[in-house]
Amino acid sequence: MAKNDSKDANKEELLEKLVKELEKNHGTGSVMLMGKGLDNSNLAVVPSGCLSLDIALGVGGYPRGRIIEIYGNESSGKTTLALHSLAEVQKLNGIVAFVDAEHALDVEYARKLGVDVDKLIVSQPDYGEQALEIVDSLVRSNIVDLIVVDSVAALVPKAEIEGAMGDSHMGLQARLMSQALRKLAGSINKSKSIVIFINQVRMKIGVVYGNPETTTGGIALKFYATIRVEVRKGNPIREGKDQIGNETTLKVVKNKVAPPFKQANVDMIFGRGIPKENDIFNIAVEEELIQRKGAWFSFINENGEEISLGQGKTNSVSYLMENPDILDYLEYTIRKKHNLIIPDYLIEKFESNSSKGKKVKSEELQEN
C-alpha cells in the first residue's frame, strides 16, 4: 500500500514537471491541469435578447468566446434575432459590430429594435476575404463583445467577384470559410467575443430520403459553431384581416454547452421584431403562470388575487403593456424559475435583499 502511495506521489511530481516544461517551451497557459486552469462551471453568457430563446439555450444566453450560427429560410427573422442580441449587449454597456456582407442593413429597423446605431460598428466589405479579415481584427482587438456577420451566403470570394459571369468556382466559398474558421476559432475563444454568423438555407439536388435542406458555405461552420439555431416561419398572426406578423419557431439544433433540440415559439411582429410583452405572455401561458379559461386569460398575483387580463391574446397582451408592474412580475418569476440573469431593476422591485439572484452589472460584460 505504501509502495502504491509513493508511486502515485512520484507520478504527480512528474506530471507537474511535464506541465512546467511544456509551459516553458510553448508559453504560459498553453497546457494546464483542468482542476487548476480551465473552469467551465461558471460559463459567462450574454442574454440573446429573447427570453424564450434564453430558456431554450439552457444557459441563459449565448456563451462568450464561442461561434453561433443562426440559419433559416428567407424572411424568417434571422437578422431580427441577431439585432435583438446587439441591442441586449449594448444595454449592458458592451461594444457591438455588424459586418453587413449583404449591404442590406435597415438602420431605422435596427433603431426600432433598441440598437443604438450611433455606437454600432458597421462594415460593408467588398468581398468575403475582406469581411473575414475585418472579423478577425475585431476579435483580436479584445474590446468588441458581439460581432454579427450577415450573411455567410454573401461572403463571396474575391476570385468569383473578379471573374466573368458563368465561370465555375466550385468549392471556393467552402474553402474560404474552412480556412477562416480554423484561424478564428482560437482567437474568438481567447478574446471572449461572441461571433454570430447568419446563414441561408439551400435545397440539395436529388435527395429522396431525409431533409433536402442544407446551409451555404460548406460544412466547416456546422463543426465550429457551439450553438446552431434554426429559425422557421410558421402561421401568420392577424389583426382582423391584416397580417401583422408570423408565429416563429427557434430550434436549437446544436448545443455544446447544454442539452440540444429545445425550441422556443415566438411572435415575430412586422416592424417590431419579437415584442417583450408577447414573449413573456407566451411563456407565462405555457408555464401556467397565466390561466386560460376558454377565450379568457387571467393572472393570480403575489397576494393571491385573480386579475382578468382580457378576452383573447391580443387584448391580454395589450393589458400587460398597459400594466408594466404585472409584466415585470411575470418576467421576474420566469427568470427566477429558470435561473436566468435577473436585471437590477427587477431585483430592486421584487427582492428586499438586493444580493439575491443573478445581478447584471454594466461592468460584468467587460470583466467576464
Swiss-Prot record:
Entry-linked PANTHER family: MITOCHONDRIAL DNA REPAIR PROTEIN RECA HOMOLOG-RELATED (PTHR45900:SF1), RECA (PTHR45900)
Function according to Swiss-Prot or TrEMBL: Can catalyze the hydrolysis of ATP in the presence of single-stranded DNA, the ATP-dependent uptake of single-stranded DNA by duplex DNA, and the ATP-dependent hybridization of homologous single-stranded DNAs. It interacts with LexA causing its activation and leading to its autocatalytic cleavage.
DNA damage is among the record's keywords: yes
Record lineage: Bacteria, Thermotogati, Thermotogota, Thermotogae, Petrotogales
Name under which the protein is recorded: Protein RecA
Chief location of this protein within or outside the cell: cytoplasm
The keyword Hydrolase belongs to this UniProt entry's keyword annotation: no
Domain of life: Bacteria
Residues annotated as binding ATP: G72, N73, E74, S75, S76, G77, K78, T79
Keyword annotations of the record: ATP-binding, Cytoplasm, DNA damage, DNA recombination, DNA repair, DNA-binding, Nucleotide-binding, SOS response
GO terms of biological process kind: DNA recombination; DNA repair; SOS response
Gene3D superfamilies noted in UniProt: P-loop containing nucleotide triphosphate hydrolases
A GO CC annotation given for this chain: cytosol
Family stated for the protein in its record: Belongs to the RecA family.
SUPFAM superfamilies in alphabetical order: P-loop containing nucleoside triphosphate hydrolases, RecA protein, C-terminal domain
Location(s) in or outside the cell: Cytoplasm
GO MF entry, a single one: ATP binding
Family annotation (InterPro entries): AAA+_ATPase (IPR003593), DNA_recomb/repair_RecA (IPR013765), DNA_recomb/repair_RecA_CS (IPR020584), P-loop_NTPase (IPR027417), RecA-like_C (IPR049261), RecA-like_N (IPR049428), RecA_ATP-bd (IPR020588), RecA_C_sf (IPR023400)
